[in-house]
């Protein structure tokens, strides 16, 4: 494959992997609390990456470890817990749709912090995307009173974290291999994740069958949805642009919504409209 074909291949594979992550989180929360889930996700990913990528760690120059730590925090550590907490209160399909604001947030942060230029159509995209988000959240809160849609703000914060991560990688880590970045990230996160897991009460409930069942889902999420996916994503950022790489979030809701339907989740007609408006906003904000 040439570079153009390869970047689209990576984009589709990532959409399939990450679109399935939201239902894995939902299944994991059956037997785990959010802090146990987030910690196990990172521990499984770290174990997998250290096995295949340990030899790549010495290739990271000392002065770049601060950016490895920052991308670890914004790209995985904080979002891993935010998504898990949010999905205790809102559907996985709603969470995935709000996550599609990542390219829009990438553009905003790129302009405000990393001094990238805005265009008029992109400003329109930002406004339209925010309108769609408000519609999705407010209508969901009205029609699903059993869900606490104030937790949707956690998904929006996670989206901002992802956007920060993408800009940092493109600006400061483009010369490193994706395997080095991924392995470095999870090496940094391993000890904090183990500490949080220890104090989460996980080892008191590990023998309960539903907990063990949930751990299997999170093992898949950690190794495939986090470990392998991160390597592909970092490679995609390096071979394309931050906005193209984060446009994977156009496709993620389609996959996540399919899984949600199989698990008896349903959006209202107005929420469908809100989701469509968000995607229009993201599309406009991504246009060059």
Predicted features along the sequence, with ranges:
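Hydrophobic alpha-helical transmembrane segments of multi-pass integral membrane proteins
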Residues: 6-10, 36-51, 70, 121-131, ...
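A helix-boundary/kink motif common to multi-pass secondary transporters
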Residues: 33-34, 91, 114-118, 177-178, ...
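Membrane-interface helix-cap regions at the ends of transmembrane helices
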Residues: 20, 24-27, 31, 45-61, ...
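Hydrophobic/small/kink-forming positions within alpha-helical transmembrane segments
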Residues: 16-19, 23, 50, 73-77, ...
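C-terminal transmembrane-helix exit sites in multi-pass transporters
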Residues: 48-58, 103-127, 254-273
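Hydrophobic transmembrane alpha-helices of multi-pass small-molecule transport proteins
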Residues: 49, 69, 118-140, 193, ...
């Amino acid at each position: 494959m040439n570079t153009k074909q390869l970047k689209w291949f990576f984009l589709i594979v990532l959409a399939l992997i990450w679109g399935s992550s939201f239902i894995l989180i939902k299944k994991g929360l059956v037997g785990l609390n959010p802090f146990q889930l987030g910690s196990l996700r990172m521990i499984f990913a770290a174990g997998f990456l250290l096995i295949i990528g340990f030899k790549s760690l010495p290739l990271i120059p000392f002065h770049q470890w601060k950016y490895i730590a920052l991308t670890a925090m914004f790209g995985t550590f904080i979002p891993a817990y935010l998504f898990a907490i949010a999905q205790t209160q809102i559907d996985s399909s709603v969470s995935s749709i709000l996550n599609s604001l990542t390219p829009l947030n990438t553009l905003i942060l790129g302009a405000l912090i990393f001094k990238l230029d805005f265009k008029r159509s992109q400003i329109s995209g930002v406004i339209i995307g925010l309108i769609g988000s408000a519609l999705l959240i407010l209508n969901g809160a009205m029609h699903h009173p059993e869900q606490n849609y104030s937790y949707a703000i956690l998904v929006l914060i996670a989206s901002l974290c992802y956007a920060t991560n993408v800009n940092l990688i493109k600006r400061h880590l483009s010369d490193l291999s994706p395997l080095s970045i991924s392995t470095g990230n999870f090496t940094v996160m391993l000890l904090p994740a183990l500490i949080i897991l220890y104090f989460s009460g996980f080892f008191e409930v590990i023998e309960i069958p539903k907990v063990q069942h949930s751990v299997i889902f999170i093992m898949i999420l950690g190794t495939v949805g986090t470990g392998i996916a991160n390597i592909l994503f970092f490679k995609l950022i390096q071979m394309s642009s931050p906005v193209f790489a984060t446009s994977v979030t156009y496709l993620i809701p389609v996959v996540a919504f399919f899984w949600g339907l199989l698990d008896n989740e349903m959006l209202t007609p107005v929420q469908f409209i809100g989701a469509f408006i968000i995607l229009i906003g993201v599309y406009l904000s991504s246009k060059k």
